[in-house]
């Protein structure tokens, strides 16, 4: 709960009738809970404002939960993944700078905590990916995380931002400066009690080398464009708004399955070579990896546009499947009756 910016954090234990039977109140006053995880007789809670306290809480007696210990470090964890009974993985952001009331978040941080001494948990390993502006689906969707202890494997999506000499900062504070988005895909990490290291990277955002087109709205009637599945679309009409000379193009295809489908200029600009397609070569929601899994010795990564198979041994590409265009309609095509 929060009153006038002074937040209070509580843990409550409920019985089967949803009645409160135990509680720990007023944890980390002025901070906010970012993540929580339960394992056996312990609960782990991360709060954050300026630094990141990791609380270890004993819930073996549901009526008398108690804080066993806590660790204060820079950064925060949006997601906690249990490694084993004495170790926890935190996935979140590193932080630096700021003042006594806040810190600037930086790149994605992955840390391994040793909680075997519950009164004195320790951060034993960590890795920071990218600069301020780097992000990951794993911070808001736990299903985006692939972890396998036996294989020392951790895979998370990453949108990588990096700073350069032209990067602008706030009030000349370098910690406040955002990096430029330079890459998008999945980081494949080695993780064990001795290390967290990069094994390799996989992207679905392949570099485009085909033709580049003008804006679809500037194309004449009769112009054609080809979508990612090879279907040819033709501009057949320009619709004008009432009381305005501005109009938008209408495009159709003779491809099977699109008999009643009409796309406008914006849809066409997202086809290969279109102005939005080229502009979004680095940052593209459609090609952003959202899930990963493995079978035998093959790692599969999944985005809206494709499924890619890579060897778990050396991450070499084995195969890929392009998803049909009808699976990619996120741009509001107009459907006629």
Language-model regions: role of each:
Residues 1-337:
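Feature marking well-ordered beta-strand scaffolds used for ligand recognition
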């Amino acid at each position: 709960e929060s009153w006038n910016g002074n937040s209070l954090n509580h843990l409550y234990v409920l019985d089967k009738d949803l009645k409160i039977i135990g509680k720990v109140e007023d944890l980390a006053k002025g901070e906010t809970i970012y993540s929580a995880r339960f394992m056996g007789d312990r609960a782990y809670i991360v709060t954050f404002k300026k630094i990141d306290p990791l609380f270890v809480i004993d819930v073996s007696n549901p009526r008398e939960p108690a804080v066993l210990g806590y660790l204060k470090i820079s950064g925060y964890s949006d997601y906690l993944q249990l490694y084993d009974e004495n170790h926890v993985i935190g996935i979140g952001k590193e932080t630096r700078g700021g003042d006594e009331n806040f810190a600037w978040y930086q790149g994605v941080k992955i840390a391994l905590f040793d909680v075997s001494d519950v009164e004195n948990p320790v951060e034993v390993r960590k890795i920071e990916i990218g600069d301020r502006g780097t992000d990951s689906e794993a911070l808001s969707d736990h299903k985006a995380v692939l972890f396998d202890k036996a294989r020392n494997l951790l895979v998370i999506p990453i949108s990588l931002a990096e700073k350069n000499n032209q990067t602008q900062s706030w009030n000349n504070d370098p910690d406040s400066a955002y990096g430029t988005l330079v890459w998008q895909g999945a980081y494949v990490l080695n993780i064990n009690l001795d290390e967290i290291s990069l094994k390799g990277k996989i992207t679905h955002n392949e570099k485009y080398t085909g033709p580049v087109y003008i804006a679809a709205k500037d194309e004449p009637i009769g112009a054609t464009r080809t979508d990612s599945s090879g279907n040819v679309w033709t501009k057949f009409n320009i619709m004008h708004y009432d009381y305005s000379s501005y109009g938008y193009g209408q495009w159709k295809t003779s491809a099977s399955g699109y008999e009643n489908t009409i796309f406008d200029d914006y849809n066409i600009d997202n086809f290969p070579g279109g102005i939005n397609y080229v502009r979004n070569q680095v940052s593209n929601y459609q090609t952003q990896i959202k899930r990963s899994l493995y079978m035998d010795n093959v790692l599969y990564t999944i985005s809206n546009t494709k499924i890619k198979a890579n060897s778990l041994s050396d991450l070499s590409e084995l195969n890929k499947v392009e998803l049909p265009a009808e699976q990619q309609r996120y741009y509001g095509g107009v459907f006629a009756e």
